[in-house]
Amino acid sequence: MKKLSSISTALGSFLLSVSFSLPTFANINVSDLTQKLPEGSNVGFIAKNINQNQIIADYNGSTFMLSASTQKVFTAVAAKLALDDQFQFETALLSNGKIQNGNLDGNLIVRFTGDPDLTRGQLYSLLAELKKQGIKKINGDLVLDTSVFSSHDRGLGWIWNDLTMCFNSPPAAANIDNNCFYAELDANKNPGEIVKINVPAQFPIQVFGQVYVADSNEAPYCQLDVVVHDNNRYQVKGCLARQYKPFGLSFAVQNTDAYAAEIIQRQLRQLGIEFNGKVLLPQKPQQGQLLAKHLSKPLPDLLKKMMKKSDNQIADSLFRAVAFNYYKRPASFQLGTLAVKSILQKQGIRFGNSILADGSGLSRHNLVAPKTMLSVLEYIAKNEDKLHLMETFPIAGVDGTISGRGGLISPPLVKNVIAKTGSLKGVYNLAGFMTNARGEKVAFVQFINGYSTGDLESKTKRAPLVQFERNLYNELYKY
C-alpha cells in the first residue's frame, strides 16, 4: 500500500507539472473593450488560437448579424472548391451561318458568361476578329446569349436607393466596364440657372434633368436625386451649390442587355462591318461555330482582386458561376445560395439558420454568426496548402481595404493582421488572421452592427472604432 501511495503521489506530481507547463488561455474581456464604441453598437467577436485549437475570445459569437463583405470569404472558398484554378470567364462569338464573299450569312451570336472584368476595349478586339476573317457584312440578326444566368441580376435585399450606384451595378451575364458609366455636370452657373449635363459619346445612355444652381441660402438644403426610366434613361433632379469646375457622377447601367447590344452595334460600325438585322434575346443557350473568344484572367487572379479590393462584381459573378457549374443549369442568386451552402457543408461548415442572399455581402438579408465565419477561417487555415487563399486577404498597413485601417497600422499589428473587411452603413466587420506574440496563428471574426455616431463629422466618427480595434487586437496579440 505504501508503494502504491508513492506511485500515486509521483503521478500526481507529474500531472501537476504537466498542467503548469501548458499555456493557459484566459478569455479576452471583449465586453469591457466595447465601452469605447458608440452607445447602441452591437458587437459579435470570436477568436481561436489555431495552433492550440483553443477559443480565446467569444462575445456574442452565436448571434446573427449582417456579414457585409466578409461574405466574400464564403464565395472565395466555394469558388476554389467548385472551380479549378484554370477557370476563366469566356466571351465568345459564334454563328450558325457561313462566311462567303465577305458576308456572314447567318446570325452573329455573342455569348456572355458574366465576365466581371470585360472592358469595352476587349470587346472591340474580339469583334475585330470578324474583320480579320474577312467579314464585311452580317446577313442575319445579333443574338445575345446570356443564358448562363437567370432571374434578377441583383440579390434579394439590395437597398433600392443604392441601385443607381456603381458599387451596386448589376453583375449580369453581359457585363461591360463593370456596367458602370459616368456623366459630367457643369454647375459653374449663376443661381437659378440650369446645370449642363454631358454624357461622353461612348456611352449609349441618356441623362437628362432640370438641376439648377442654388444660392447660398438654399444650397445647404439641396440634394441630387436620380430617377431611372426605361431604355437606360436617367433623370437627375434637385439643386446644388455653384461648382467652379465640372465634376463627374457615376451611374449603374440598368438594362444590361440593351446596353451591350448597342455597344456591339456601334463597334461593328466602327469596324466597317455592316449590320441591319434585329437584336434577339433568347432564353435558351445558343449553338454555333466558334468564330472567336476572349478569356478573363484565371480564378486566382480574380479572387485576389475580389478579396483585396472587395470587388462586388467579381464576387456575385463567381457566386452564380459556382452555381452554374455545380448544378449545370442557369444560375439565379437563389441557386447561388444553395450551391455555396452545399459545397461548404460538405467540408463540415454548419450554417444552421444562417441566411446567405448573395456572394458580395451587399444584401441586408444576409445573417451570419461570427462562429460560422470562424469555422470557414479554420477550414482555410487547415487547407491553405491547396487553397492558397490567405495571400488574397488584405494586409494591415500594406494593401487592400485595410491598408489605412486606423486601429491596425501600428506595430505589432501592421503587416501582421490580414483580414477581409465588411462595410455597410453602420457595419464595420473584419474576418481574418494574425500571428500572436508567441508566433501562433490566431483566427478572428469581428462583427459590429448598428454603429452610429449621430451628427459627428465623418473625420471623427471612426475615432471610437479606431480605439476599439487598436485595443482589441493588441490584446489578441498578447494571447
Swiss-Prot record:
Give the top-rank taxon of the lineage listed in the UniProt record for this protein: Bacteria
Q: Which InterPro entries match?
A: Beta-lactam/transpept-like, Peptidase_S13
Binding of substrate occurs at K420
One of the GO BP terms on file = cell wall organization
The top EC class, named as a word, is hydrolase
Q: What is its main location?
A: periplasm
Its UniProt entry gives the catalysed reaction(s) as: Preferential cleavage: (Ac)2-L-Lys-D-Ala-|-D-Ala. Also transpeptidation of peptidyl-alanyl moieties that are N-acyl substituents of D-alanine
Q: Please state the pathway this protein functions in, per its UniProt record.
A: Cell wall biogenesis; peptidoglycan biosynthesis
Localization:
Periplasm
Signal sequence, renumbered to the chain: 1-26
Pfam families tied to this protein: Peptidase_S13 (PF02113)
- Record-listed E.C. numbers: 3.4.16.4, 3.4.21.-
One GO CC annotation = periplasmic space
Molecular-function annotations in GO: serine-type carboxypeptidase activity; serine-type D-Ala-D-Ala carboxypeptidase activity
UniProt entry keywords in alphabetical sequence? Antibiotic resistance, Cell cycle, Cell division, Cell shape, Cell wall biogenesis/degradation, Hydrolase, Peptidoglycan synthesis, Periplasm, Signal
Q: Catalytic residues per the record?
A: S69 (acyl-ester intermediate), K72 (proton acceptor), S310
Kindly give the PANTHER family that the UniProt entry links to this protein.
D-ALANYL-D-ALANINE CARBOXYPEPTIDASE (PTHR30023), PENICILLIN-SENSITIVE CARBOXYPEPTIDASE A (PTHR30023:SF0)
Relate the protein's function as given in its record.
Not involved in transpeptidation but exclusively catalyzes a DD-carboxypeptidase and DD-endopeptidase reaction.
Family to which this protein belongs: Belongs to the peptidase S13 family.
Instruction: Tell me the protein's name.
Output: D-alanyl-D-alanine carboxypeptidase DacB
Q: Which organism is it from?
A: Haemophilus influenzae (strain ATCC 51907 / DSM 11121 / KW20 / Rd)
